[in-house]
Design a protein with these regions (language model features):
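Structured catalytic-domain cores with a bias toward divalent-metal coordination
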Residues: 1-182
Length: 182
């Protein structure tokens, strides 16, 4: 996270949610000699969203991955010091992710962006269900205080679709089993 200058990270510890991380972890365990996992680490890096990457950011991320590999001893280090975590870094277990679902279908007006910090009950979006009618707008509030991790790219949504993800200060209000995108 420090090498990539991440604002947030989801922490996962081998469980049974069948997440991508677990699939990678199982491969590592299968290849470990005698079950010795000392010095081993599994991580997945999601390099931004579809709308967020430009050449400068891609280069910064590539350099960050290279620095991570240097730190793990995979690539020979250079003279630069290892980076530290950001002062505002958010690292929480995956169970702290609140998936905010759309209660209705319609057009989305976001009031927050990824990287914003929100308070419980704060309006994070509105869904327009019936344009021009006062009752045709549904306000969406944050279920708890936390960090906006992602939000939907498309501005149209169906009832029940993922609207945004918030890494909460506490475990998710709507606790769920399985991978985030089930």
């Amino acid at each position: 996270a420090a090498c990539l200058d991440c604002e947030a990270a989801l922490l996962w510890n081998a469980g049974s949610d069948r997440a991508f991380e677990e699939a990678a972890y199982e491969q590592m365990v299968a290849k470990a000699k005698g079950g010795d996992l000392a010095g081993h680490c599994v991580t997945t890096v999601e390099l931004r969203g579809q709308n967020d990457v430009d050449p400068a950011l891609a280069l910064k991320d590539a350099e960050g991955i290279y620095r991570y590999l240097q730190g793990r001893g995979v690539v020979a280090p250079d003279a630069r010091p290892a980076p530290g975590l950001r002062k505002d870094f958010v690292g929480k277990p995956i169970r702290h992710v609140d998936m905010v679902l759309a209660p209705v279908g319609g057009t989305i007006l976001f009031h927050v962006a990824p990287g914003d910090r929100v308070e419980a009950g704060q309006m994070v979006a509105e869904i327009i269900t019936d344009p021009g009618r006062e009752c045709g707008i549904v306000a969406i509030q944050a279920p708890q205080a936390g960090f906006v991790l992602t939000r939907r790219i498309r501005r149209f949504i169906r009832m029940g679709d993922n609207l945004l993800k918030i890494i909460g200060d506490e475990p998710a209000v709507a606790s769920r089993k399985g991978a985030l995108e089930d």
